[in-house]
Amino acid sequence: MEPLKLGNITLPHKAVFGPMAGFTDAPCRRLMAEHGAGFTVSEMVSSRALVYGDHKTVSLLKAEPNGAPYGVQIFGEVPEIMGQAAAAIEQYRFDFLDINMGCPAPKIVSGGAGSKLMLDPDVCGRIVEQVVQNTSRPVTVKMRKGWDADHITAVECAKACEQAGAVLVAVHARTREQMYTPGIDRSIVRKVKEAVHVPVLGNGDIHTAEDALTMMRETGCDGVMIARAALGAPWLFERVNAAIEGLPAPKEPNLQARMNALRRQVEEMVEQKGEFVAMPQARAQTMHYMKGLKGASALRRYCCELSHLEDIDTLIEAVFDQQRRAADADDNREIPFP
């Protein structure tokens, strides 16, 4: 099996971790890399903020050695400013630069950035050209199927990006109009793969190893990008990698392993950001670890109340207690959190 490459960078695996605002900080990226993510990417950062030297924005670039290539994702709608942003961060430690052409958030598209760029493939190409000219790192692009049902432009945008120097394209198989509603169109990933010569990643609704194999089999894509499904379940990468590489499926982590991962992630968040900043962010992170547990909705409500690091121990104790009580009850009814 040919390895997946970003320019001169060879990835360890073909399943990679996609960027998500508010989630893919350094502790989260480290956890995913340890479980086999082929690369990780920062939260998206504003090109304008980078050019103006905003310290809060620059803090999002923080890199931690984690054994996998690390990319910085930037967003913006003005080619020249995107190029200036690429130049402004040359001094920082990262392996590749990713351009956001897929974010569907209203506050991003209202300014003309994110998936709004896909309405104009020429602008997409000019942005990539400016970034390539101003960085020494390989440049990748994350995009969607298109803007809406009347503007399916992924193929045109991908070709423009490739011509301008992008070395990889990741395609989320929904339009911006669809946001994250159920149902993806894998055929758009196949069409992009057939239209360009650079590696293509398929993205969207990859929750299991079989989902990943289906994406690769039906589209011919070179790898898969997993994002939301890996939150609270970093071991998903181990299962997907094993399936892609034809290896035996790894064992499912037990509850203790899951809670150990949760605690370590939150501890590192507090260590890096301080409790006041980290704990509100940890509420959303910890909710994902409740997936599949008995009484999960009650446990998620408790996650919303986390304020101090020691609250994590109380949460973990509650998780174990909830599962014991559910097992004793021997049914699937939710047991109210005390």
What positions do the PLM features span?
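Active-site beta-loop-alpha junctions enriched in small/polar residues
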Residues: 20-22, 45-47, 75-77, 102-104, ...
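Hydrophobic faces of well-ordered beta-strands that scaffold small-molecule active sites
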Residues: 15-19, 40-42, 70-74, 97, ...
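Glycine-rich, positively charged N-terminal anion/phosphate-binding segment
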Residues: 2-7, 20-95
